[in-house]
Every structure is written in structure tokens, then in C-alpha cells.
Regions:
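A well-structured
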Residues: 1-157
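Active-site recognition of the HExxH zinc-binding catalytic motif
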Residues: 7, 141, 241, 245-268, ...
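Short acidic (Asp/Glu) and glycine-rich catalytic loops that position anionic groups and cofactors
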Residues: 21-28, 81-85, 184, 233, ...
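Contiguous, non-catalytic segments that form substrate-binding/exosite surfaces or channel walls
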Residues: 101-248
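Short, glycine/acidic-rich hinge or "gate" loops at secondary-structure transitions
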Residues: 122, 186-191, 270-275, 301-310
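Hydrophobic/aromatic-lined pockets within catalytic cores
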Residues: 156, 176, 180-183, 208-212, ...
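Divalent-cation-assisted or electrostatically stabilized phosphate/pyrophosphate-binding catalytic cores
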Residues: 276-282
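Long, amphipathic alpha-helical stalk/connector segments used for oligomerization, subunit docking
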Residues: 297-348
């Protein structure tokens, strides 16, 4: 039992440090001065080195071998830690550090390139990220496993690229046909006007709280790309503002709130353990999409949203609740996944 207790204590501290690294990433995308990018890259590299050393500590292997879990929960924790330990052992420490530094540095470069609409600024560092990601994939790939399959395991354990292709190949024809039918229907109404940024943020905070987001254990901020970060009692979300398109803010907020509520809703007994975060990216995305689409684009919700938008913004360019319902469910082609409608999103 001592081995199991020692392993859990070590693992808990490691996960606490990983949360600190996550807060550094959150800060970089929300609050950090732009000039701090190079220093933040070094800080993230240092955190990655510490985390890699803890995750590959030889004592972890000894504790795993000697541990005697007493119930199914303990077995699940041990199984997850063992899998992660064996995977981390395959990654050279220098590679783990280099990846953390590079991906941190590339974030600011991407944001600058996006703001100036100049992809050439980002392409060199993107190539570096891809090259290092290939090195990582080759390092962790198991027997008869392709590098891409090895990377997919970071997000959806046990699935392969072939299985994904089979699933997408099955989905695509129906989605394309549905999109063409929708595009051939009568045009949906569109909102019009300019929508004050501060008023959008106030509405976004209200939306998040009303669907269950606990703001005593989280906060909403602005970022170039909306995301959710953290777990347990510190789960933060971001959104973005376009004054000519309030749906960008509204539906990004609902989507990220779905992620956040999933994390906030995990049993407190599992916090800071191997079972203390979302089970997979697929399950995580199901929660955000349920909030965004099944809730946020429903007829009942649009009735509430119409009143909120009229009260806060005045005339929004659509006549009534039904018109807003059609507007938020409008199907259209587009290249931006986070702004895609319910049909187009899955084609991305």
C-alpha cells in the first residue's frame, strides 16, 4: 500500500505543476505583454523539463510495479499513470523541452500573422513545429503504429487514422447533401448593425453563468482564439469579439462553457489525480457542442436570447424570435471552423 500512496502523492504534485504550466499558457493568450514572448518560451521550456523529469522518475516505475490498488478507482488511476509513464519514457528530455519552448514562441508569431493577414510570417515556425511533432510521434509510436496514430492517442486513446477516415468517409456524403439542401432553401435572415464590445462581454458572462458555469471557480476573458483551460476549481474560458458579428462571441462563449462545465462537474474526489480531467477530446467536444447547438441554437433558447439582445443592443436587424432562430441556424460555406454552422463544422 505504501508504494501506491507514494505514487499518488508524487503524481498529485506533478499534476499541480502541470496546472501551473497551463496557467502560463492561459496568461500568454490573455494577459501577457506581447514583448514577454521570448521569456515565456523559456519559462515554458523550464516547466516542461521539470515535468518530464518527474514523469520519468525511476521511482515511478518502481511504485507502479509494487502498487496494490484496492478498488476499481485505484486500478484506473494506476492504469492511466502506467500508460503515461511508459509513453513519456520514450520522449527524450531535450525534445520535450524544445517542443514546449517552440510551441510557446509560435503562439505569438501566429497571432501577429493572423492580425496582419500575412501567413508568410508564420510558415517558418509552423514548419519547425511540424518537424518537432514528427520527431515526437516517431519517438512514442508503438510497434506497427504510424506516427499519426501515435499523435492521435494524445487526444483519443485507442483510435487509429484508418478508423477516423472510415467514420469521416461515412459522414461526409450525407453532410454535403444536407448542406446543399440548406443552401438551396430560402435565405435565412441576418442580423445587422454594430454591437458594442463591452455589452457583448457582459452578455457573454451572463450566458455562461446561466448555463451552469461557476464563476467563483473560473473567469471569462478575451483571446485571439477561444479556448477553455484548467480543471477542478480553476477552469477558465475565453471568447472573442467582432462588433459586426455578436454570434462570434455568443456561440464561442456557449461552446467553451460546455467544456468548462464538464471539467467543473468532475467528482471533486478525482481532482489532481489521473482521473481528474475529461476522459477524451471526443467526449470533451461532445459536451461543448451539446451546449452550443442542442441548447444554444434551440428554439426555446433563441426566444430568451432575442429578448436579451433587444434589451442590450436595441434593433438587431431581425424582426422576432423566429427570425433570430433562423439566423443562428443559417447554413453557409466558410473557412473558419470556430465560426462554422452546425452542418459545416463537421465538414471541417
Amino acid at each position: 500500500m505504501t508504494a501506491y500512496v507514494d505514487l499518488m502523492a508524487h503524481d498529485r504534485q506533478t499534476r499541480a505543476l502541470a496546472q501551473v504550466a497551463g496557467r502560463l499558457s492561459w496568461d500568454q493568450e490573455t494577459m501577457m505583454p506581447r514583448g514577454a514572448s521570448e521569456q515565456r518560451s523559456e519559462e515554458q521550456g523550464a516547466m516542461a523539463a521539470i515535468l518530464h523529469a518527474r514523469r520519468t522518475d525511476p521511482r515511478v516505475g518502481d511504485w507502479i510495479s509494487a502498487a496494490q490498488p484496492e478498488d476499481a478507482v485505484a486500478e484506473a488511476k494506476l492504469r492511466t499513470i502506467k500508460r503515461d509513464y511508459e509513453r513519456e519514457l520514450k520522449v527524450p528530455a531535450e525534445l520535450a523541452t524544445a517542443l514546449a519552448r517552440l510551441t510557446s514562441r509560435s503562439q505569438g508569431i501566429w497571432a501577429d500573422a493572423r492580425a496582419s493577414d500575412d501567413v508568410a510570417l508564420f510558415l517558418p515556425v509552423l514548419k519547425e513545429v511540424v518537424d518537432l511533432s514528427r520527431d515526437y510521434a516517431e519517438a512514442v509510436a508503438g510497434d506497427n503504429q504510424t506516427p499519426y496514430d501515435a499523435l492521435v492517442e494524445n487526444y483519443e486513446l485507442g483510435i487509429t487514422a484508418d478508423e477516423l477516415h472510415e467514420m469521416f468517409d461515412h459522414m461526409r456524403p450525407g453532410l454535403v447533401a444536407l448542406r446543399e439542401r440548406a443552401l438551396g432553401a430560402s435565405p435565412a435572415p441576418e442580423i445587422s448593425g454594430l454591437f458594442d464590445a463591452d455589452t457583448q462581454i457582459a452578455l457573454a458572462n451572463d450566458i455562461a453563468a446561466r448555463v451552469g458555469y461557476d464563476t467563483t471557480r473560473g473567469r471569462l476573458d478575451l483571446a485571439v482564439h477561444p479556448f477553455s483551460s484548467g480543471s477542478g476549481d480553476d477552469v477558465r474560458i475565453t471568447t472573442r469579439i467582432a462588433e459586426d458579428d455578436p454570434f462570434n462571441c455568443i456561440y464561442s462563449t456557449i461552446h467553451e462553457t460546455g467544456h468548462a462545465c464538464y471539467e467543473q462537474g468532475i467528482d471533486p474526489a478525482y481532482r489532481m489525480t489521473a482521473l481528474g480531467s475529461g476522459v477524451s477530446m471526443g467526449v470533451h467536444e461532445s459536451q461543448s457542442r451539446i451546449y452550443e447547438n442542442q441548447l444554444g441554437r434551440s428554439r426555446a433558447y433563441c426566444g430568451w436570447l432575442y429578448g436579451q439582445m433587444r434589451d442590450r443592443f436595441g434593433d438587431i436587424g431581425v424582426a422576432d424570435e423566429d427570425a433570430l432562430y433562423r439566423a443562428v441556424n443559417r447554413v453557409h460555406r466558410g473557412y473558419i471552423r470556430t465560426e462554422a454552422d452546425e452542418v459545416q463544422y463537421n465538414l471541417h
